[in-house]
Swiss-Prot record:
UniProt KW Membrane keyword: no
Protein name: Dihydroorotate dehydrogenase B (NAD(+)), catalytic subunit
Gene for this chain: pyrD
InterPro entries: Aldolase_TIM, DHO_dehydrogenase, DHOD_1B, Dihydroorotate_DH_1, Dihydroorotate_DH_1_2, Dihydroorotate_DH_cat, Dihydroorotate_DH_CS, Dihydroorotate_DH_I
Residue ranges of the TM segments: none
Homology family: Belongs to the dihydroorotate dehydrogenase family. Type 1 subfamily.
Species assigned in the record: Fusobacterium nucleatum subsp. nucleatum (strain ATCC 25586 / DSM 15643 / BCRC 10681 / CIP 101130 / JCM 8532 / KCTC 2640 / LMG 13131 / VPI 4355)
Amino acid sequence: MSERLRVQIPGLDLKNPIMPASGCFAFGIEYAELYDISKLGAIMIKAATKEARFGNPTPRVAETSSGMLNAIGLQNPGVDEIISNQLKKLEKYDVPIIANVAGSDIEDYVYVANKISKSPNVKALELNISCPNVKHGGIQFGTDPNVARNLTEKVKAVSSVPVYVKLSPNVTDIVAMAKAVETGGADGLTMINTLVGIVLDRKTGKPIIANTTGGLSGPAIRPVAIRMVYQVAQAVNIPIIGMGGVMDEWDVIDFISAGASAVAVGTANFTDPFVCPKIIDSLELALDKLGVNHILDLKGRAFR
């Protein structure tokens, strides 16, 4: 892989800045049957909680214009099973793992972070304080700066690897949230998570999602995501992994231009399971067209 795409941020030596977003790539093993996942910059695996979660009732997914709504509810087999099974299977691949950590209270987050950060192939944690689809935990931690800072401090104290905090767009001031978790010791940020929305059944007029609301993702949210990255990148001194509606290499360049250091691809994996390697293969040609040598030469050019 060309050095033109290599990116180094806390805990992560990325051969390229492209990674699948948590919740859109399962645990990566499934995609390993389709292509060499070692080609990816990193893998953000599905959220881990202290105990197994069965998620929200169905229906949990609805298609929207230029996107989708989901309310999966952090379904996962629990941190112990993830460590002994899914993470174990990923050890043979040359790709750093970012483990997504979720919980119902601070004690849950601390428990999961302490355990999963000790796994040899986990190089960073993604602290999920912004999931809008669970009744307890998630978004309640992601909308109060003081609560978010406190949680970040507690997780940092027990984590063996750098901690990236996933920010919610469902706030009035995302810069305040970013500064709060930076003060709490966050090594980096991932942003943005989904926007809260509702899709109605045209015949009944009732919400399609059993949970009523869900998280909106896909190209529809990309301008919002880029705006928020643009704002936060100028306010903090820690790196950002940008995400929100990325479909191709030019979307990646937009996020880098807005101030991100790396980019995660989410919903696009459902429409094209090969989207990540396709983007990686196209990035250098895009750099050539722009007349730049390295991907990070574009970082923050929107406000420089």
